[in-house]
Amino acid sequence: MKRERSAQLHEQALDVILGGVNSPSRSFKAVGGGAPVTMERAQGAYFWDVDGNRYIDYLAAYGPIITGHAHPHVTNAICEAATNGTLYGTPTPWEITFANMIREAIPSMERIRFNNSGTEAVMTCIRVARAYTGRVKIIKFAGCYHGHSDLVLVAAGSGPSTLGIPDSAGIPQSIASEVITVPFNNIEAFAEAMSKWGSETACVLVEPIVGNFGIVAPEPGFLEEVNRITHEAGALVVYDEVITAFRFCYGGAQNLLGVEPDLTALGKIIGGGLPIGAYGGRREIMEQVAPLGPAYQAGTMAGNPASIRAGIACLEVLKQPSVYDEFERLGARLANGIIEAANKHGVTIQLNRVKGALAVYFTDEPVHDYDAAQKANGEVFARFFQLMLNEGVCLAPSKYEAWFVTTAHTEEDIQFTIAAVDRAFSQL
């Protein structure tokens, strides 16, 4: 598959855009380097690049494009918003409608505030938790990405009872020392950390189903124990549902799993392909936020009509009958086909799946936490990624990212993808 124009444009981008990309996750550094594919059009489950090549898309913009690209209902909502003005700086009727839709779907979010991204939503949840508890420290789980704010770009220290270390240049150790990182799905390590730091902890930050080192579901009882131990210490549970909300059911992963947090952060899917974030939770906690309380949060673009109306339209599509049943059916079909192809060609993989989201790890060890995910063979993944790209299947260029099925994918797309996987595995 020729991509000469992509290579030319990447050279031009390098001259004006830092690193040639506007997010490092779009770089091909982790999959052998070279020019990333430059896309110029998307429709339904498909991309077309600047060289005219078509791809089946499982990237879904890292999750938000759950209804497929340019879904007519979502597109019409965006066009109507553009016609009537995209930004007012005032309240609008649509933000009330949308907030009510979210609260009906995720009842733990008794009061809601919109902002501009998942990063902002998580960052503000932490601020609100600190304001409510009067404490400072945060506990998070290793490998879980919660945005690029200083508060959460922190890696584990030498053990679960030690303070964190910065996971990026430019983050002071003084900030990292307020964050404790423990392994996901390890309740003993979490209990150990809480026994040492619980009285100083404002909140525990949780992806209820991990979506940032593939797809990893919680072990039975893990989330319930996290809630119990956290609340016994007087701290709050914050769910980062930026990836998971409306991905697995019409609501949050918390609905699917039957465990409620105190605060929830949202993003990605709820914007219908436009920038958005939201956070919410128990009324008495949320009332810490201005103008009702002392915790400040604001945003010029927050609640803008374009993003809000796109989000309303997206949820209206997802609320239609059988949408999530079809995600399950197609997700299972795809996963089974990948496993069959791996067995056929003697390729060692682990495959994790929840509904229409899955992850393929080139390792012989089951992946229940970040340590196991790190052991997946990145060189083999890089070869697989390039082979799939040449087959016309677009995946995220990282061994840690998930595949996402959308409402636009068809049985024919799944069959095409399985055949492509079979050919790719034959060449590994």
Curated annotation (Swiss-Prot):
The gene is hemL1. It comes from the Bacteria. It catalyses: (S)-4-amino-5-oxopentanoate = 5-aminolevulinate. Keywords: Cytoplasm, Isomerase, Porphyrin biosynthesis, Pyridoxal phosphate. It comes from Brevibacillus brevis (strain 47 / JCM 6285 / NBRC 100599). Its cofactor is pyridoxal 5'-phosphate. It is found in: Cytoplasm. Homodimer. The modification N6-(pyridoxal phosphate)lysine is found at K268. One of its GO terms (cellular component) is cytoplasm. This is Glutamate-1-semialdehyde 2,1-aminomutase 1. Pfam families: Aminotran_3. It is an enzyme of class 5 (isomerase). One of its GO terms (biological process) is protoporphyrinogen IX biosynthetic process. Belongs to the class-III pyridoxal-phosphate-dependent aminotransferase family. HemL subfamily. GO terms for molecular function: glutamate-1-semialdehyde 2,1-aminomutase activity; pyridoxal phosphate binding; transaminase activity. Pathway: Porphyrin-containing compound metabolism; protoporphyrin-IX biosynthesis; 5-aminolevulinate from L-glutamyl-tRNA(Glu): step 2/2. Its EC number is 5.4.3.8.
